[in-house]
């Protein structure tokens, strides 16, 4: 069986559904496929998002996918003294929501469908269809049969492993151990957490990573940890670190776990090349996860919108060359690469700092008004209060 579309999107996470939504809106016959039977499940996310980027992708908050609206974030150093306070007044980027990720993902897919995109679930891509050096579709298992889905443009949104991108011929990047974060999260009830703030804890409690607490409502929260795998002795280390943190904090130690989530996150540099003739990769597949925060929803959805724009241009001009695809790479790199690269270098350095140095950094930043977590502004503040740290941090300057 063969079907034909203008655009085939592989993967119905936020990036893929965003690409399908905007492609369909532009009048392109669009198919969005998802390998799992249930979009958004299983949840593999801390579920915290800021709100500053939402207007760019025309996303309006909906009560059914919001668990809690927060006023800001608090970042604690190892001693857990005065935290960095990120609020609407001094860092509006950190004001946002704790979401129900499965409902959020379904909502974005529903927006794509409402614009006219077809959606297939339990429909994995099995292989690439090529015409010469151009990607022209995929073989897909759908309703127990193999379907040749032919498309003028293919958008891969299949996560940081991006099997489809590898099958198509994109160079498979072997991630360094410093560029992979192993994560464990408990959804907990009967906890004492502040519903107005997301909390982050730095230091040896989570080597080269952090612990997060995202409130999900009254006495309920996601309590999780991400640890760079280069700091792990064995696969149980991450859970052990999280359990030790919870045990040492009475507000959480009396809580009950009702869900366990595990997974991994890539915190690498952006791919050098993430397109081929007829193929664009978006979101995690293009390695657009922020290296400092590990967050990828915003970057993914914005890149999905960009991919739809370039797909429309390519189809209108019947030009599927690498030169046309490079327009998408330029848009993505212009938007994300400078900050992304800076944050990658910062991540590399911050992972080497002692608890004592991290405490001094938090102490400095807690007294400085900043608009975002900016390496440049942090260093300026450090130079004023702890000049002896400048040499240690010189690789960030």
Swiss-Prot record:
Which UniProt keywords are present, listed alphabetically? Answer: FAD, Flavoprotein, Lipid biosynthesis, Lipid metabolism, NAD, NADP, Oxidoreductase, Phospholipid biosynthesis, Phospholipid metabolism
Instruction: Please name one Pfam family that this protein belongs to.
Output: GGR_cat
Q: Return the broad EC class.
A: oxidoreductase
Cofactors named for this entry: FAD
Which cysteine pairs make disulfide bonds? Answer: none
Task: Supply the EC number(s).
Answer: 1.3.1.101
Q: State which pathway it belongs to.
A: Membrane lipid metabolism; glycerophospholipid metabolism
Q: Could you name the Gene Ontology cellular component terms for this entry?
A: membrane
For this UniProt entry, the molecular function terms from Gene Ontology, in alphabetical order, are: flavin adenine dinucleotide binding; geranylgeranyl reductase activity; NAD binding; NADP binding; oxidoreductase activity, acting on the CH-CH group of donors, NAD or NADP as acceptor
Q: What's the miscellaneous note?
A: Reduction reaction proceeds via syn addition of hydrogen for double bonds.
What HAMAP family does UniProt report for this protein, alphabetically?
DGGGPL_reductase
Q: Which family does it belong to?
A: Belongs to the geranylgeranyl reductase family. DGGGPL reductase subfamily.
Q: Could you tell me what this protein is called?
A: Digeranylgeranylglycerophospholipid reductase
């Amino acid at each position: 069986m063969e079907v034909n579309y203008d655009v085939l999107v592989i993967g119905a996470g936020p990036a893929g559904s965003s690409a399908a939504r905007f492609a369909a809106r532009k009048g392109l016959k669009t198919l969005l496929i998802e390998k799992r039977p249930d979009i958004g499940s299983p949840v593999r996310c801390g579920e915290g998002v800021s709100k500053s980027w939402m207007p760019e992708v025309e996303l309006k908050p909906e009560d059914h996918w919001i668990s809690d609206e927060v006023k800001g974030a608090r970042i604690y150093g190892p001693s857990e003294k005065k935290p960095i306070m990120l609020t609407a007044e001094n860092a509006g980027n950190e004001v946002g929501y704790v979401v129900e990720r499965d409902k959020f993902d379904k909502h974005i897919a529903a927006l794509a469908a409402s614009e006219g995109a077809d959606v297939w679930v339990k429909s994995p891509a099995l292989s690439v269809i090529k015409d010469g050096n151009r990607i022209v579709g995929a073989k897909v298992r759908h309703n127990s049969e193999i379907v040749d889905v032919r498309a003028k443009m293919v958008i891969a949104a299949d996560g940081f492993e991006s099997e489809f991108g590898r099958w198509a011929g994109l160079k498979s990047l072997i991630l360094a151990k410093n560029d992979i974060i192993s994560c464990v999260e408990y959804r907990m009830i009967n906890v004492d957490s502040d519903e107005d703030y997301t909390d982050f804890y730095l230091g040896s409690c989570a080597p080269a990573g952090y612990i997060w607490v995202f409130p999900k409502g009254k006495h309920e929260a996601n309590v999780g940890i991400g640890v760079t795998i280069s700091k792990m002795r064995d696969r149980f280390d991450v859970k052990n670190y999280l359990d030790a943190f919870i045990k040492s904090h009475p507000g959480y130690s009396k809580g009950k776990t009702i869900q366990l989530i595990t997974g991994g996150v890539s915190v690498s540099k952006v791919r050098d090349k993430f397109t081929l003739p007829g193929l664009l990769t978006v979101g995690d597949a293009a390695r657009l996860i922020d290296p400092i925060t590990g967050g990828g929803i915003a970057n993914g959805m914005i890149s999905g919108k960009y991919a739809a724009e370039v797909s429309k241009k390519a189809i209108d001009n019947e030009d599927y060359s690498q030169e046309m695809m490079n327009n998408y790479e330029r848009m993505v790199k212009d938007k994300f690469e400078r900050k992304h690269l800076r944050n990658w270098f910062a991540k590399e350095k911050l992972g080497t700092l002692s608890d004592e140095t991290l405490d001094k950094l938090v102490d400095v930043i807690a007294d400085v008004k900043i608009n975002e977590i900016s390496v440049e502004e942090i260093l300026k503040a450090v130079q004023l209060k702890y000049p002896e740290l400048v040499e240690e941090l010189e690789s960030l300057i």
